[in-house]
């Protein structure tokens, strides 16, 4: 019975760092660690006093969004923004 109570108490124990690493803030794709791994670079400090380690390989995977080309001379009319499709209703039959 005592062992059962100890197991129940351990289930509700909240770990400070847990199994999952905390992510950095300020749009940095990295994790807060005490020491950075090989191939990672130090960006900024985390709130817990650890280093924000960002992986160069991960940042190369993310491609920045490019805005579509805007026509400077001509303006598109409202009619060209959408197409009216023919529909069949009860009243047209």
UniProtKB/Swiss-Prot annotation:
Biological processes annotated in GO: defense response to Gram-negative bacterium; defense response to Gram-positive bacterium; innate immune response; killing of cells of another organism
Keywords from the named record: Antibiotic, Antimicrobial, Defensin, Disulfide bond, Secreted, Signal
One GO cellular component, as annotated: extracellular region
Stretch forming the signal peptide: 1-18
Domain of life: Eukaryota
The keyword Signal is assigned to this record: yes
InterPro entries: Beta-defensin, Beta_defensin_dom
Localisation: Secreted
Matches recorded under Pfam families: Defensin_beta_2
Cystine crosslinks: 24-52, 32-46, 36-53
Main function: Has antibacterial activity.
Family: Belongs to the beta-defensin family.
Name this protein carries in UniProt: Beta-defensin 128
The organism's taxonomic lineage, starting at the top: Eukaryota, Metazoa, Chordata, Craniata, Vertebrata
